[in-house]
Every structure is written in structure tokens, then in C-alpha cells.
């Protein structure tokens, strides 16, 4: 289990991400990169594009 804060958890081998509105969500990748839109994320070693919909290396 990954602890995002005192009340929110994500499954093991995932990453906690926080949306711009303060809502936590789980990225399905270990050490994932959270995108600014608060909905998407990328694998470790990749980054989100400006639209937060594509992952770039």
C-alpha cells in the first residue's frame, strides 16, 4: 500500500497523484510522473506533454 496522506491510499507499486483541485488519484506506474491535468500520468522516465494526454521520453 502507498500512503498519499492520512486518509488516502493507493495499491502497492503505484504512485499517488494530486489533482489541481486537491483530489488524490492513483497512477498505475511505480514512480510515475503525474500530469498537471490531475487525471493522467506517465511511466517513470517519461513526462507529460503540454496537453497532459501524451507521454514523452
Swiss-Prot record:
Family matches, as InterPro entries: Granulin (IPR000118), Granulin_fam (IPR039036), Granulin_sf (IPR037277)
Paired cysteines (S-S): 4-16, 10-26
Q: Which UniProt keywords apply?
A: Cytokine, Disulfide bond, Secreted
Q: Which domain of life is it from?
A: Eukaryota
Query: What compartments host this protein?
Result: Secreted
Please report which protein family the annotation says this sequence is part of.
Answer: Belongs to the granulin family.
Tell me the function of this protein.
Answer: Granulins have possible cytokine-like activity. They may play a role in inflammation, wound repair, and tissue remodeling.
Q: What is this protein called?
A: Granulin-2
Q: Which organism is it from?
A: Cyprinus carpio
Please spell out the taxonomic lineage of the organism that makes this protein. Eukaryota, Metazoa, Chordata, Craniata, Vertebrata
Amino acid at each position: 500500500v502507498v500512503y498519499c496522506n492520512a486518509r488516502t491510499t493507493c495499491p502497492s507499486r503505484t504512485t499517488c497523484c494530486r489533482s489541481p483541485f486537491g483530489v488524490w488519484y492513483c497512477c498505475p506506474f511505480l514512480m510515475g510522473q503525474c500530469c498537471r491535468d490531475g487525471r493522467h500520468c506517465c511511466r517513470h522516465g517519461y513526462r507529460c506533454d503540454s496537453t497532459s494526454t501524451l507521454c514523452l521520453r
